[in-house]
């Protein structure tokens, strides 16, 4: 772990989040979020960063991925029960903004066959891109299930106009170790994106959806 957040602090915060949750059982699986507050950063002038990092354990088990596939990929997706759409189904949306928006809302992320990816903007318009869900490419050499898992366990840091951001790093059914490892990966990656690394970090918290925030830094 980087020297700025000690192992003990991290484990203590994780235990607080997980045990706080055990006291109040919710009817849904609470996500654990890493909340970051930045300083010495001017979103207007400084370069807005964005980057993705793959975590060891999938932070959101219910995260849904849809394959926009050629015939072979659609057949594969069907065989393993992964949601999919072929090019004909996409053409039927007829670039209708409402329908494309609905599609973007329905799934958390998309994969598209390499052969189709360049055609997506032409067939669907800019809707998926606007929603921040432009598909990742899927080749025929890749194992589809593994690729979907990779998408599910990848998180994105994106600096917008404000000096705080939040990302899902896990959920409350994880073990302490799984959650600590995910947070460790996420924090170190985030700090590496910042212009002045730790000097740009004002505070770090973790919290479950309904729980109290626990300060890490």
Curated annotation (Swiss-Prot):
Pfam families: Ribosomal_L1
Cross-link position per record: Glycyl lysine isopeptide (Lys-Gly) (interchain with G-Cter in SUMO1): 118
Classification via PROSITE patterns: RIBOSOMAL_L1 (PS01199)
Covalent link (Glycyl lysine isopeptide (Lys-Gly) (interchain with G-Cter in SUMO2)) residue numbers: 118
InterPro entries hit by this protein: eL8/uL1-like (IPR050257), Ribosomal_uL1 (IPR002143), Ribosomal_uL1-like (IPR023674), Ribosomal_uL1/biogenesis (IPR028364), Ribosomal_uL1_3-a/b-sand (IPR016095), Ribosomal_uL1_CS (IPR023673)
CDD domains per record: Ribosomal_L1
Keyword field: Acetylation, Cytoplasm, Isopeptide bond, Phosphoprotein, Ribonucleoprotein, Ribosomal protein, Ubl conjugation
Any GO BP: translation
Subcellular location: Cytoplasm
Protein's UniProt keywords contain Coiled coil: no
GO cellular component: cytoplasm; large ribosomal subunit
Keyword Phosphoprotein: yes
Domain of life of the source: Eukaryota
Modified residues (N-acetylserine): 2
Annotated SUPFAM superfamilies: Ribosomal protein L1 (SSF56808)
Subunit structure: Component of the large ribosomal subunit.
Family, similarity comment: Belongs to the universal ribosomal protein uL1 family.
Function of the protein: Component of the large ribosomal subunit. The ribosome is a large ribonucleoprotein complex responsible for the synthesis of proteins in the cell.
Protein name: Large ribosomal subunit protein uL1
Gene name as annotated: RPL10A
